[in-house]
Amino acid sequence: MPSAPHYSSKYYDDKYEYRHVILPSEISSLIPRDVLLTEDECRKLGIRQSDGWEHYANHKPEPHILLFRRPHSGIPNDVDYL
């Protein structure tokens, strides 16, 4: 059984909430490089997040790291701000 994805803490700029997900090699080997996944495809691979997260980029030097974002309506007081 593959190990589970690792989820970063959330971080923010003035428009988006961000996080990255580090996939175990068993899962990352199933994803073609330079492909952005839909929310449904992410769930089928075992990536579990609340609704609205967009897979907007892959970390080129480390393709097992997927970058996600979603719009926010305000930044919580206890989080990192870019």
Swiss-Prot record:
One of its GO terms (cellular component) is SCF ubiquitin ligase complex. One of its GO terms (molecular function) is histone binding. PROSITE patterns: CKS_2. GO terms for biological process: cell division; regulation of mitotic cell cycle. The keyword Cell cycle applies. Pfam families: CKS. Keywords: Cell cycle, Cell division. PANTHER family: CYCLIN-DEPENDENT KINASES REGULATORY SUBUNIT/60S RIBOSOME SUBUNIT BIOGENESIS PROTEIN NIP7 (PTHR23415). Binds to the catalytic subunit of the cyclin dependent kinases and is essential for their biological function. Belongs to the CKS family. Forms a homohexamer that can probably bind six kinase subunits. This is Cyclin-dependent kinases regulatory subunit. It comes from Dictyostelium discoideum (Social amoeba). The gene is cks1.
